[in-house]
From Swiss-Prot:
Keywords on record: Cytoplasm, Glycolysis, Lyase, Magnesium, Metal-binding, Secreted
Assigned EC number: 4.2.1.11
Active-site residues, record numbering mapped to chain: E209 (proton donor), K342 (proton acceptor)
Coiled coil: none
Compartment(s) of residence: Cytoplasm; Secreted; Cell surface
Full protein name: Enolase
Binding, (2R)-2-phosphoglycerate: Q167, K342, R371, S372, K393
Family, as annotated: Belongs to the enolase family.
GO cellular component, one term: phosphopyruvate hydratase complex
Subunit structure: Component of the RNA degradosome, a multiprotein complex involved in RNA processing and mRNA degradation.
Catalysed reactions, as listed in the record: (2R)-2-phosphoglycerate = phosphoenolpyruvate + H2O
Residues annotated for Mg(2+) binding in this entry: D246, E290, D317
Xref: NCBIfam families: eno (TIGR01060)
Gene name in the database record: eno
Annotated organism of origin: Yersinia pseudotuberculosis serotype I (strain IP32953)
Length: 431
């Protein structure tokens, strides 16, 4: 009943209006899985390759017809007749057939779309929700938890057209008892933030991930306006709501210095920028910082981990790119204490699960994440619950491409009830 009989690839549009790959996997019992690959803006240099056509006459060169052709051609031929329930085998077949280190032959966007569609079809054939199937693939059947959301309510850096250097300023509704309550708190703070910004004469247009993207006097001012919004919403900062940041520091690392253009081109060494961040953590209840230095600055990251690693969660995104080889090196060297998990950085479900397992086995936390270019596909919600990862980063409280994930989490929590606890701040490293 779970043998693959047909695979279809197509070019669809993501939340930024760019093409991406969608795949359908059909099984002999009539079961179908449908999945789409997301796409990043601030990408790590060691990510698996997202294959684009480069034909400037279509979609400004961003078409994905080559990747779609790979799905409809060699990938389909290789996986038809195989058992979709054997995820590791499906993924291995595609990776081996691609034959490159970074999936550049077919594109990680092609391989991932088929990988996720196969998992969805297999779950349907087993008559179970995707999160339950993922828990079985993960070797943790029946073990679930609802993730603490990191909600990106002020966007800067590569995600917005403003003067804020740090890419994401996030809230975590740690005072919530359930995921559904966390979403409500996030929504209320989000709306109060709009009022705070408007009162200051600031822009309330939103960035790629649904957060506001105002021009501010400094990066610290983003934290100040969020603190004001939390209070206005009737919550206590540090008790009901904590803060998190994604610096995406690789984006402002120039000639060995960290240059904050939005603050008059202030330049910092690795140590100085670490202490700049440390000062912010003393002023505000920041419990998690992602990519606080450049992805290649391992000596700096080691220092940052020594200074901040026992106090807060230090998440490697561009640093680790969901890659077990790089994560292993980070664990051995004592660099960071958490990994951001993005399917499309590595390009298959099997490799994603391996990265989560490696992190957890080493005492690192794993934060499941969207990309800035998303679709209505909400698979990361099921991934977060099915691996009991504990944390999720899927944008703000606007744009359907973000909200789709929160809504799926609400549905899953309703279905699982007490079987999926919401552990809040306990999930965050160092808290």
């Amino acid at each position: 009943m779970s043998k693959i009989v047909k695979v279809i690839g197509r070019e669809i549009i993501d939340s930024r209006g760019n093409p991406t790959v969608e795949a359908e996997v059909h099984l002999e019992g009539g079961f179908v899985g449908l999945a789409a690959a997301p796409s990043g803006a601030s990408t790590g240099s060691r990510e698996a390759l997202e294959l684009r056509d480069g034909d400037k006459s279509r979609f400004l060169g961003k078409g994905v017809l080559k990747a779609v052709a790979a799905v409809n051609g060699p990938i389909a031929q290789a996986v038809i007749g195989k058992d979709a329930k054997d995820q590791a085998n499906i993924d291995k077949i595609m990776i081996d057939l691609d034959g490159t280190e970074n999936k550049s032959q077919f594109g990680a966007n092609a391989i991932l779309a088929v990988s996720l569609a196969a998992a969805k079809a297999a779950a349907a054939s087993k008559g179970m929700p995707l999160y339950e199937h993922i828990a079985e693939l993960n070797g943790t059947p029946g073990k679930f938890s609802m993730p603490l959301p990191m909600m990106n309510i002020i966007n800067g850096g590569e995600h917005a057209d403003n003067n804020v250097d740090i890419q994401e300023f996030m809230i975590q509704p740690v005072g919530a008892k359930t995921l559904k309550e966390a979403v409500r708190i996030g929504s209320e703070v989000f709306h109060h933030l709009a009022k705070v910004l408007k009162a200051k004469g600031l822009n309330t247009a939103v960035g790629d991930e649904g957060g506001y993207a105002p021009n501010l006097g400094s990066n610290a001012e983003a934290l100040a306006v969020i603190a004001e919004a939390v209070k206005a919403a009737g919550y206590e900062l540090g008790k009901d709501v904590t803060l998190a940041m994604d610096c995406a520091a690789s984006e402002f690392y120039k000639d060995g210095k960290y240059v904050l253009a939005g603050e008059g081109n202030k330049a910092f060494t690795s140590e100085e920028f670490t202490h700049f961040l440390e000062d912010l953590t003393k002023q505000y209840p920041i419990v998690s910082i992602e990519d606080g230095l450049d992805e290649s600055d391992w000596a700096g990251f080691k220092y940052q981990t020594e200074v901040l690693g026992d106090k807060i969660q230090l998440v490697g995104d561009d640093l680790f790119v969901t890659n077990t080889k790089i994560l292993k090196e980070g664990i051995e060297k004592g660099v960071a204490n958490s990994i951001l998990i993005k399917f499309n950085q590595i390009g298959s479900l099997t490799e994603t699960l391996a990265a989560i397992k490696m992190a957890k086995d080493a005492g690192y936390t794993a934060v499941i994440s969207h990309r800035s270019g998303e679709t209505e596909d909400a698979t990361i919600a099921d991934l977060a619950v099915g691996t009991a990862a504990g944390q999720i980063k899927t944008g703000s409280m606007s744009r359907s491409d973000r909200v789709a994930k929160y809504n799926q989490l609400i549905r899953i929590e309703e279905a699982l009830g007490d079987r999926a606890p919401f552990n809040g701040l306990k999930e965050v490293k160092g808290q």
